[in-house]
């Protein structure tokens, strides 16, 4: 077991928390991290790019000029790829972009990403976050207290509760702040839906609550 300090939103230390080494302090597997991010970015591709071949563009039914005696290069159709408005050779067509990883590799990637941030001292645990109403100024005050005004920050919360929803609304105007509520209320079992490797490693600091730490340990431990 390792320990991590717990802070309040005023950046005052209020205690420590035991965290599992097998989740937050493993030797990161960079290959699996790469595979996970590659999978995420690949699966975001729409695959809708499409061009027309010479058989699909309009026109080109007859030979534009005689084969001989014009002094011009021979041509059989004005929709040849050599012509303006002609068909495209080897252009993109709609296709399915999809990659997947097995559950074991996905969990290893999440653990690796969390461990990277923990070892960099870029993992911050808050005792609680209470937002009675959305207010961007309050989020900016928290960032200021921790010296993160110009830092890419990821906030992780465990449940779709009013206080966390209000925080998410408060932060939506801040371009360097992302908030993930890692929960799917439609599932009966506990889950960390929304928690992903790309956002973990794309942020410079990760801020989460004690509840979120416990939930991560319970679900992916």
UniProtKB/Swiss-Prot annotation:
InterPro entries: Ribosomal_uL4, Ribosomal_uL4-like, Ribosomal_uL4_dom_sf. One of its GO terms (cellular component) is ribosome. Pfam families: Ribosomal_L4. Residues 46-74 are annotated as: Disordered. It comes from the Bacteria. GO terms for molecular function: rRNA binding; structural constituent of ribosome. GO terms for biological process: translation. Keywords: Ribonucleoprotein, Ribosomal protein, RNA-binding, rRNA-binding. Belongs to the universal ribosomal protein uL4 family. One of the primary rRNA binding proteins, this protein initially binds near the 5'-end of the 23S rRNA. It is important during the early stages of 50S assembly. It makes multiple contacts with different domains of the 23S rRNA in the assembled 50S subunit and ribosome. Forms part of the polypeptide exit tunnel. Part of the 50S ribosomal subunit. This is Large ribosomal subunit protein uL4.
